Curated annotation (Swiss-Prot):
Gene3D superfamilies (alphabetical): 3.30.450.40, Heat-inducible transcription repressor hrca homolog, domain 3, Winged helix-like DNA-binding domain superfamily/Winged helix DNA-binding domain
The protein's name: Heat-inducible transcription repressor HrcA
The keyword GTP-binding is assigned to this record: no
Organism: Kineococcus radiotolerans (strain ATCC BAA-149 / DSM 14245 / SRS30216)
Lipoprotein recorded as keyword: no
Functional summary from the UniProt entry: Negative regulator of class I heat shock genes (grpE-dnaK-dnaJ and groELS operons). Prevents heat-shock induction of these operons.
Keywords for this protein: Repressor, Stress response, Transcription, Transcription regulation
GO biological process: negative regulation of DNA-templated transcription
A Gene Ontology molecular function term of the record: DNA binding
Family: Belongs to the HrcA family.
Pfam families (alphabetical): HrcA, HTH_DeoR
Alphabetical list of InterPro entries matching this protein: DeoR_HTH, GAF-like_dom_sf, HrcA, HrcA_C, WH-like_DNA-bd_sf, WH_DNA-bd_sf, WHTH_transcript_rep_HrcA_IDD
Length: 346
């Protein structure tokens, strides 16, 4: 659609419908917006927009509401994403900078997104398919127990408490762990998790006979940590926000909540959005563009985050009704993703 005036009319309809929850008529458009034309001209423009599938008339109402196609054109033609205020940016930064580790960052992020957008928020844990081992720590913690800590270059931490039954006594366990720690780090630091896991067999075979049993137990636990690190995970918050706006969903609320409970569905959706995006930028899917059962009446706004512009580790975003304040929501998702990326890069 090349007519700038009709695009302005569509933009006004979207903005008014999102703010008022009511179908929008030509008279209201003339009163609220400086469109510079008569109500009759507005009615003609609305007729064309309806004929082309950008707006529709719900039931017997005299007003019109946007269709998925109308929302899509509105989003695609946004001149710029509405910036957040300095106060909002400071609040986001302060809240996220208090995080202790990746788990805390993800937890704070998903709660923050749900709060500021009033939608359901989804955060994918940093993908470790390309992550490397930063450090492995082995610490005796009393008796024949030991703490194994795996730290990746993305900040992810996996840990296990081991009951090392093969150790003769606490002193010999401490000595074996110290020697193992040096050999393990020399072997796996800097390697991808999958590659590091494959090296564990050689590591055990090259261990001196006196420490062989301890090394075997440590290798099993470290292998579990490396495997756990490769699992894809998502967290969700703010489903209560969907309950509050259930009347705005064109599909049943139950279907949406059911889909959100299936993390496999969410992971598949996130993967598709990653493929759609350009280097982790903002991606918006509207209504029927979401092909997954139960989500075709919602809109999803996501952005990638990572440790740098070329290192996108995962995605975060929100899901809500198609009647969404897209400029504000897109600004919030973009701002949060940037702050999370800065924290991970530190």
């Amino acid at each position: 659609m090349s007519d700038d005036r009709r695009l302005a009319v569509l933009r006004a309809i979207v903005e008014d419908y999102v703010s008022s929850h009511e179908p929008v008529g030509s008279k209201a458009l003339v009163e609220r917006h400086q469109l510079g034309v008569s109500p009759a001209t507005i009615r003609n423009d609305m007729a064309v927009l309806e004929e082309e599938g950008y707006i529709t008339q719900p039931h017997t109402s005299a007003g019109r509401i946007p269709t998925d196609k109308g929302y899509r054109l509105f989003v695609d033609r946004l001149a710029n994403v509405k910036p957040m205020s300095p106060a909002e940016k400071r609040a986001i930064q302060t809240f996220l900078e208090g995080a202790d580790d990746v788990d805390d960052i993800v937890d704070r992020t998903v709660r923050l997104l749900a709060q500021i957008t009033r939608q359901a928020a989804v955060v994918q844990y940093p993908s470790l398919s390309r992550a490397a081992v930063r450090h492995v720590e082995l610490v005796p913690v009393g008796g024949r127990s030991a703490l194994l800590v795996l730290i990746t270059d993305s900040g992810r931490v996996e840990q296990r408490v081991l009951d090392v039954r093969s150790a003769a006594d606490p002193e010999s366990l401490a000595a074996a762990l110290a020697a193992l720690r040096t050999r393990v780090n020399a072997r796996v630091v800097g390697k991808r998790l999958r590659d590091a896991r494959e090296d564990l067999t050689d590591l055990v075979q090259q261990t001196p006979p006196g420490d062989l049993a301890v090394a075997a137990e440590v290798a099993v636990a470290l292998g579990d940590c490396l495997t756990a690190g490769l699992e894809e995970r998502v967290v969700i918050a703010g489903t209560a926000n969907l309950v509050k706006s259930g009347a705005d969903l064109s599909t049943s609320l139950g279907s949406v909540l059911e889909a959100l409970e299936e993390h496999v569905v969410l992971l598949r959706l996130v993967q598709e959005l990653t493929e759609d995006s350009d280097r982790g930028g903002l991606t918006v899917r509207i209504g029927a563009e979401n092909l997954h059962l139960g989500l075709d009446g919602t809109s999803v706004v996501t952005s990638g985050y990572g440790t740098g512009p070329d290192t996108v580790l995962a995605r975060l975003g929100v899901l809500g009704p198609t009647r969404m304040d897209y400029p504000t929501t897109m600004a919030a998702v973009r701002a949060v993703s940037r702050y999370v990326s800065r924290i991970l890069a530190q």
